[in-house]
Amino acid sequence: MTKDILILAVETSCDETSVSVIKNGRDILSNTVLSQIESHKRFGGVVPEVASRHHVEGITTTINEALVDADVSMEDIDAIAVTEGPGLIGALLIGVNAAKALAFAYDKPLIPVHHIAGHIYANHIEEPLTFPLIALIVSGGHTELVYMKDHLSFEVIGETRDDAVGEAYDKVARTIGLNYPGGPQVDRLAAEGEDTYSFPRVWLDKDSYDFSFSGLKSAVINQLHNQRQKNIPIIEANVATSFQNSVVEVLTFKAIQACKEYSVQRLIVAGGVASNKGLRQSLADQCKVNDIQLTIPSPKLCTDNAAMIGVAGHYLYQQGRFADLALNGHSNIDLEEYSAE
């Protein structure tokens, strides 16, 4: 009988302290998440120093809770996986150093995991990945289209040239007057309004899979500024609908076109913005029309969590891709350089 592989995973790249135990690359035995949203809400966004402080305060308790919830001990664990980047460097270092301490104390292999690879592998938990596939990554810090021909093989075929889609959502939300985190509130409002503004769709060069959201963001900000200057009433739901329609149309079109060009029948979506109901519906509609299998994780697996890191870590474990205790956190890591040879 094949021995079960247990991975203890640690994720601290931004404002969630999360630890998970994953069995055999798919089964979540525990997935403890300590959120910091309330602490950052009064600042209107994540404050790196505050995030780091909360990680320091919560990491030990979160590790213990994950082990208890999984009903395992450190002796049962086969390897420690940890997000090494990209992310907030101070936040990353808390998780990396905690993972290194565990690896040293219990003589376990240490597995560095790319944060975006983790988001991609969140899909594998609910629906096993089949290749080739196109991955649409949409989050607060990243907007990318990635072609994968096999496990841990990443070819970035498109990326944002300026703002990430989640960043644009948060800035538009603040301009409208919505509280942090603004993305989910824009999505909720968008379901209630009408596309009365017809904000621009930014397609960039012909056949390009790159994205740009800074112009759209500026168009929304300028529109609302002009209305306020002229005392013209602002219907928040219409602003949200018009903005979201512009974003979703571009994301959907480019994702579908990439599937067609690369002869791929599987599209997966990853990152916090994958929770967006408008985007999920648009992709579902177009994938159905084009006979493409669509996978989007449950909302709880779209946001940052250690389970996704553990799943990616499992495949790195199988390839023997370990780090020594000199491992450090990195605020920026190229996904393609991280790809398996």
Curated annotation (Swiss-Prot):
> Which metal ions or organic cofactors does this protein require, according to UniProt?
Fe(2+)
What broad class of enzyme is this? transferase
Q: Where does substrate bind?
A: I137, V138, S139, G140, G141, D170, G183, D187, N276
Its GO CC terms? cytoplasm
Q: Where in the cell is it found?
A: Cytoplasm
Q: What residue ranges carry the coiled-coil annotation? A: none
Biological processes per GO annotation: tRNA threonylcarbamoyladenosine modification
Which catalysed reactions does the entry list for this protein? L-threonylcarbamoyladenylate + adenosine(37) in tRNA = N(6)-L-threonylcarbamoyladenosine(37) in tRNA + AMP + H(+)
Protein family according to the UniProt entry: Belongs to the KAE1 / TsaD family.
Q: Per its UniProt record, what PANTHER family does this chain match?
A: TRNA N6-ADENOSINE THREONYLCARBAMOYLTRANSFERASE (PTHR11735), TRNA N6-ADENOSINE THREONYLCARBAMOYLTRANSFERASE, MITOCHONDRIAL (PTHR11735:SF6)
Record function comment = Required for the formation of a threonylcarbamoyl group on adenosine at position 37 (t(6)A37) in tRNAs that read codons beginning with adenine. Is involved in the transfer of the threonylcarbamoyl moiety of threonylcarbamoyl-AMP (TC-AMP) to the N6 group of A37, together with TsaE and TsaB. TsaD likely plays a direct catalytic role in this reaction.
Question: Per its record, how is this protein called by name?
Answer: tRNA N6-adenosine threonylcarbamoyltransferase
The record's gene field reads tsaD
